Amino acid sequence: MLENSTLFADIILPLALPRLFTYRVPRHLENQIVELQRVIVPFGKSKRYSGIVHKLHHQAPGDREARYIEDVLDEEPTINAEQLQFWEWLATYYMCSLGEVMNATLPSGMKLSSETVIRALEIGEQDNEPELTDREQLILDALKVAGELSLKDVSDIAGIKTVFPILRGMMEKRLVVSDEEIKDVFKRKTEVYIHLSEEFKEEGALNVLLNQLSKAPKQEELLLAFMSSTNGFNEKMESVSRKELLKRSGAKSTVLLQMLKKGIFIAESRAISRLGGNAATSESVSLSEAQTRALEDIRLGFSQNKVVLLHGLTGSGKTEIYMQLIRDALDRGEQVLYMLPEIALTSQIINRLRVQFGRKVQVYHSRFSENERMEVWQAVAKQSSEGSLIVGARSSLFLPFRNLGLIMVDEEHDPSYKQNDPAPRYQGRDAAIYMSGLYNTHILLGTATPSVESYFHAMSGKYHYVRLAERFGGAMLPEILIADLKEDTKKQKMKGIFSPMLLKTLSETTAKEKQSILFRNRRGFAPMLECNKCHWVPHCVQCDISLTYHKSVHQLKCHYCGYSMNVPSKCGECESTDMRMKGFGTEKIEEELSSLIPELRIARMDLDTTRSKYGHHKLIEDFQEQRIDVLIGTQMISKGLDFDHVQLVAVLSADSMLNYPDFRAYERSFQLLSQVSGRAGRRKEPGLAIIQTWKPEHPVLEWVKNHDYDGFYENEIGEREKFGYPPFTRLINLSLRHESNLELDDAADKLGNYLRRTFGSRILGPEYPPVSRVRNLFQKNILVKIEAKASLKKVKDELNKQISRFFSEFPLKGYRLVIDVDPYN
């Protein structure tokens, strides 16, 4: 670097901005700053943010005077080069900014801004009593009075412009936390250890002490237990954890406290890892002939550097194959990412993996605290053995892998892999495929019901295809019966929402001490409350959707924005008190079934009952141990769960999913119904699945009944080709949003017509979606269809250009445009 040349840095800020911003590096930071590091920069009139150094260079910005970087937050790069490439691909492919990707990717503890609020830690939350500088004491005194302060307030109080270095030091001393941390304070987990005071470590002094304690037998016993725990008298007399010492001695904590006060023992707090798990307790699993053939075929696909699609029946033993592939990668010293679509799946699979791989297995998903996620992040970045096998939802893609050898995407067909809000609106499976190329690693997609796109790529030779066509251990596929609700209703045989076939089979299943699963893709008690006189229905005040009744809290709730209200005693239109519940959800199923068969032990598994960190784990454990006879659930019970004693699975209403206005409706219905049915009879006894419907002749139900994926696919791919839908086209959805539907109509029509000048018949709409207003914003969609052979990059570049021109020519106020590439909804 030339001595007189000025160093500049392009910074990624965690904001939805279309470009990077260039800052000047002050001389005193030139030897500290490196690319991909976090820095503090000013932005706007008074705000400050932590950003990532994208690039260092000597080119001054031509449009403005560059402002100075204020501080460097890390000694080393925060992210690695592969992560940056991955960020850039996400931003380009999904048409969003690098700042939006950064905001979604980094744990909240790594993001600071001038809007961050600081508060003091309570006494007892602090690890010790550190020495304070005058400024630190000044800030703490102010916090004790105010409770919390913005960074601007702290700056004014301390009398300095840049407060980040001081606050960083105070955070390290455990004096203060930021608002991101208040939700889940990021601090090392600690455990108290006890060691003997130095003055008693000589044998003579220790004997004198033992004689003195003969008059205090409980303290004497505790000292002897300590010596036993540290292998008797020796020069080191190493420490023992407080928890273990009290357990071994049987002493009460008050006895230990007395000895601490006397100075016999000294207590110290030590940081320990949150990354749990025991050592591995089992060797590798043995595979059947069919599994062994599939494993060898997968390895063949890996040797050809292809994406591998494993198409295995429900209950065919895909997980055992996954575990062998994991073992191969770990034996090579590589990191492994095992992706699952649903948090509910993790507890069961984690238990199986930890038996095989012990502490190497770690979990990364949103239900875990910021503390735990940060420790997993750090373990992955350091290539620690604790964290060499990561099990997680789609966000686990963003971890700082350095030696990634294998990615497995289980249930690859699942729509939960798609991020809807906020940006980047990425598809986890597709992002994983790109990432496998970036890291030059193997990738396996596994499912019993492949997505139409993945199967198409497998049949065309783009992916390597492996079929596992028999269930593990000789288990038979479940028999699937269709219950005709129209006929049963006509003959007045229905008992509420239950067909006679289902009730009879439920009773028989329980009598045999077997278990049942009931599926309904709607939580809550009833879909809606309706006036029996004028048919008025309470709607959300912010969304164009009826409110769902939740009996447990006796409230009506919106599942889009969270709005809730008390149940009205009379109609909001005609004031009639004749209000009726229409439809049914998981709560109502539970209540009705309890009244029909009171002896059943019933539990629900939906978002309402699994909100806590371990809510789903407790339910799965209780069901596994047969403390529950019937498990009622939403779609989370359809995905990969494996129970020994489930003989009956029932779908209470198949019609709502079959009738959904979306080109993927048949695909989703076939996948969901097949997956739910596959939970039954996964051991030697055959299972039974019952699907209740008003349309028993529906072709999707026939394919499901006959376990006929090929028949479903041939029909579906023909329809997609005929009407121009993926995989024969690519889709981009433009959602224009505004508070006024009248203004939105006008603006959306203008935008649609403007884009047709360039894209012609490839532009469809604008149209209102089924739910046309969410969170007080009306929305209209414009769909862009792109031929599969066309350059998607060129189309997106041109689309961005035309959208920018449109908003330049028509400067609309109060509008929001959301772009969704490869939309699922």
Predicted regions and their residues:
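Solvent-exposed, membrane-proximal periplasmic/extracellular interface segments of envelope transport
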Residues: 57-66, 70-76, 672, 769, ...
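A carboxyl-terminal module marker
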Residues: 753-778, 817, 821
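Accessory, non-ATPase domains that flank or precede helicase/AAA+ motor cores in DNA-metabolism machines
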Residues: 1-447, 461-475, 758, 792-825
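Short amphipathic alpha-helical segments
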Residues: 19, 241, 730-732, 778-780
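Inter-lobe coupling/hinge segments of SF2-like helicase ATPases
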Residues: 282-288, 292-296, 304-745, 753, ...
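Short secondary-structure junctions
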Residues: 597-600, 755-763, 808-813
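Solvent-exposed residues in well-ordered beta-strands and their adjoining turns
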Residues: 14, 26, 737-739, 785-787
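A short, contiguous, amphipathic alpha-helix enriched in charged residues
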Residues: 8, 33, 743-756
